[in-house]
């Protein structure tokens, strides 16, 4: 089952609530683009094997987050610079002469 960015952000909110409940409040207010957010990421990675997201509807089911660690890492390493994002996108097509000719 596909893991959406909304699923990950919902899990982050639950992680923050869990850390508050456990009185682990160090950098609990850090935003995803701040360096201190790394504490949330470390907590999530340490507990990823136990992480589930319940998806509702008439036939509720659970998504295991451990299967989606690559996607989660990608979301937590979002590119915040337009220039860096452009370079990353272009680098996907290095060696693709046809794509290069179309973009110039």
Swiss-Prot record:
Give the top-rank taxon of the lineage listed in the UniProt record for this protein.
Viruses
Repeat keyword on record: no
What the entry lists under Pfam families is as follows: Baculo_LEF-11
Q: Does the keyword Transcription apply?
A: yes
Keyword field? Transcription, Transcription regulation
A GO BP entry is: regulation of DNA-templated transcription
Function, in words: Involved in late/very late gene activation.
Family the entry assigns:
Belongs to the baculoviridae LEF-11 family.
Q: What is this protein called?
A: Late expression factor 11
Organism this protein belongs to:
Spodoptera exigua nuclear polyhedrosis virus (strain US) (SeMNPV)
């Amino acid at each position: 089952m596909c893991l959406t960015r909304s699923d990950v952000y919902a899990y982050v909110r639950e992680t923050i609530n869990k850390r508050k409940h456990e009185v682990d409040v160090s950098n609990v207010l850090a935003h995803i683009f701040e360096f201190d957010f790394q504490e949330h990421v470390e907590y999530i990675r340490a507990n990823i094997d136990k992480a589930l997201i319940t998806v509702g509807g008439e036939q509720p089911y659970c998504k295991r987050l451990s299967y989606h660690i690559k996607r989660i890492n990608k979301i937590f390493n979002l590119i915040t610079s337009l220039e860096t994002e452009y370079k990353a996108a272009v680098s996907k097509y290095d060696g693709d002469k046809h794509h290069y000719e179309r973009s110039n």
